[in-house]
Amino acid sequence: MTLMDGRAIAAQIKLEITKEVQQIVINGEKKPHLAAILVGHDCSSETYVANKVKTCEELGFQSTLIRYESDLIENKLLATVEKLNQDSNIDGFIIQLPLPKHISEQKVIEAIDYKKDVDGFHPVNAGRMAIGLPCFVPATPAGILELLKRYKITTAGKHCVVLGRSNIVGKPIANLLMRKAYPGDCTVTVCHSRTKNILKHCLEADIIIAAMGVPEFLKGNMVKDGVVVIDVGTTRVLSTETDSGFKLRGDVRFKEVAPKCSYISPVPGGVGPMTIISLMRNTLLARKKVIYS
């Protein structure tokens, strides 16, 4: 069993991005600039945004954090989005989800200029990805692809089971793994909360992407020997073992599943670091206008 070390791979990509940023500066050009909007005080969102800002600093990016209280009205947020759309100094920006319930996430996402949508959530980017055109790929699916690529996992002709159908992970990674490129050319089965015989599907899988958001959903009796398992789950659970009083738990019961795997990603330290670095790479692509001129 090989542990897929997302931290180590992300560190390699950091070096690659840092060199590109240094060259941009040497050429007398503007550093990549990522902005983030955070509404409210959700603990997970606070942590994620702090990590993104920290990574920007490490890479030599410029970053801007815009904070609002949870009682922010929708129109004010939409006005901020439009301001960022028009700001030529901002290469890309994200809106940290989830938003308070009184704000329509879809309406806000659709208000973003798709050329600055480095999260890859805008319908234009989602549609272009679906038909194989250049676009900003959502960060978590992009990170998963990079793990498969860096560990040289064979995907062509393999049966991949995706557990979960969210717009952020499940649907896009299923689409990407079907594309005519590496990593891809998989036969993909998407399972979700209404799927019958999930056990049967999982036992037939060569690759499993676990993104249900259910702690330890995938157990040892659900996988065959030699399977590749990528755990996307990051549920915060109470714990007396940590100073913070909680720990992250993945969608895979690691101790049972890992011995049967050829490759497996851990939680934490697997997909998480890859997600953040993939967002940074999207920001660099936006700065260089590689995808959209």
UniProtKB/Swiss-Prot annotation:
GO terms for cellular component: cytosol. It catalyses: (6R)-5,10-methylene-5,6,7,8-tetrahydrofolate + NADP(+) = (6R)-5,10-methenyltetrahydrofolate + NADPH; (6R)-5,10-methenyltetrahydrofolate + H2O = (6R)-10-formyltetrahydrofolate + H(+). Its EC number is 1.5.1.5, 3.5.4.9. Pathway: One-carbon metabolism; tetrahydrofolate interconversion. GO terms for biological process: L-histidine biosynthetic process; methionine biosynthetic process; purine nucleotide biosynthetic process; tetrahydrofolate interconversion. InterPro entries: Aminoacid_DH-like_N_sf, NAD(P)-bd_dom_sf, THF_DH/CycHdrlase, THF_DH/CycHdrlase_cat_dom, THF_DH/CycHdrlase_CS, THF_DH/CycHdrlase_NAD-bd_dom. Homodimer. Belongs to the tetrahydrofolate dehydrogenase/cyclohydrolase family. This is Bifunctional protein FolD. The lineage of its organism: Bacteria, Pseudomonadati, Bacteroidota, Bacteroidia, Bacteroidales.
